[in-house]
């Protein structure tokens, strides 16, 4: 049976990611790789949105991915799982870079102000550099593909013994797991590209697979939703007060106890809240859920293009740049999804979409979304 609350978490979180990237592009906190501050405000108070959502939004998506992986594997073999994840995750983050995302790479490099020496390099070399620079938001599926392969190895060893044991997880264990998440955040972090956090994201992915894929655990999370929500809101306020104005995405903040505990308890609160109040499907949720993957893949191109054309030169008022950037994120994101998903080779290379499956097969697979 399909878990609609899981779908709803996924597409709502993707919307949050899009809005986050808007504020990230024009942040006043000195985070590099983007346009930066374009307003005349002494303090950009609306940047606080980044502090409210950044610690937990990708943690939550990896938990959802872990849950979805378990749901898929209940009806498929390990071999089918690897094949599916390779098509859904590896192909778009490798072949997709060469087929389409080099465009994003060009925009990213232009925003960064690449030097004149690049223009003197051979065309093929420039193309490869642009393709690699176009990775952008696809880091998520690169990490997820590696974790999916690791999951297959783990399954061959544990043979559901650990999974069955994890079904007994109670609220005390859920609270104490915050310490495990903090420990995981300290290891396997790449030194320069801060988004590749294999320790943290690997930990919550496997927690999603082993713990949150149990219906009885979700019932406990639903029951204790008021507690988790209260703690999460308190940690959110504390995080914003302590760190606002600082680079929240890098050391030492992104490995601090406050960062990781906020991420953990907010994830618990959202899972409990959505399972309790948003376990439904209607035409609106179906529309957003169906297009969430395409929006995730393409939204940054619209945003960064507007940033390059108008934000970098500040040729129009700041408020207009914000509005135009947000509109471009959604408009181009959804438009490219509709176009690319209909072109045979590119739908496979860029979005990881193979042949269309019969509706009955889709229903059996349940929550098998690309982000799972």
Per-range role (PLM):
Residues 1-372:
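Alpha-helical transmembrane segments and their immediate juxtamembrane cytosolic regions
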């Amino acid at each position: 049976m399909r878990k609609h609350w899981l779908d709803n978490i996924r597409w709502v979180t993707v919307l949050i990611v899009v809005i986050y990237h808007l504020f990230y592009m024009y942040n006043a906190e000195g985070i590099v790789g983007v346009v930066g501050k374009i307003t005349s405000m002494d303090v950009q108070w609306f940047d606080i949105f980044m502090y409210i959502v950044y610690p937990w939004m990708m943690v939550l998506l990896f938990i959802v991915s872990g849950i979805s992986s378990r749901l898929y594997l209940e009806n498929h073999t390990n071999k089918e799982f690897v094949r599916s994840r390779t098509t859904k995750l590896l192909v778009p983050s490798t072949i997709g870079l060469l087929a389409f995302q080099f465009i994003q790479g060009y925009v990213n490099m232009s925003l960064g102000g690449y030097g004149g020496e690049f223009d003197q390099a051979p065309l093929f070399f420039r193309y490869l550099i642009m393709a690699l620079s176009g990775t952008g938001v696809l880091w998520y599926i690169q990490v997820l593909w590696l974790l999916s392969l690791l999951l297959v190895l783990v399954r061959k060893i544990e043979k559901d013994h650990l999974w069955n044991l994890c079904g007994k997880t109670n609220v005390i264990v859920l609270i104490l797991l915050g310490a495990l998440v903090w420990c995981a955040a300290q290891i396997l972090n790449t030194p320069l590209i801060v988004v590749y956090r294999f320790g943290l994201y690997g930990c919550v992915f496997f927690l999603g697979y082993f713990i949150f894929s149990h219906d009885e655990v979700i019932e406990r999370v639903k029951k204790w939703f008021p507690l988790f929500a209260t703690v999460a809101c308190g940690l959110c306020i504390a995080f914003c007060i302590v760190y606002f104005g600082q680079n929240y995405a890098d050391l030492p903040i992104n490995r601090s106890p406050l960062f990781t505990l906020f991420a953990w308890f907010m994830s618990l609160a959202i899972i409990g809240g959505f399972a309790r109040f948003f376990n439904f499907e209607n035409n609106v949720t179906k529309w957003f859920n169906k297009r969430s993957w395409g929006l995730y893949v393409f939204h940054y191109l619209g945003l960064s293009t507007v940033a390059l054309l108008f934000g970098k030169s500040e040729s129009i008022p700041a408020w207009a740049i914000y509005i135009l950037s947000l509109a471009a994120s959604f408009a181009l994101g959804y438009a490219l999804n509709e176009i690319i998903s209909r072109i045979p080779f590119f739908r496979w290379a860029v979005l990881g979409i193979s042949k269309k499956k019969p509706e009955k097969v889709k229903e059996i697979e349940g929550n098998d979304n690309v982000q799972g």
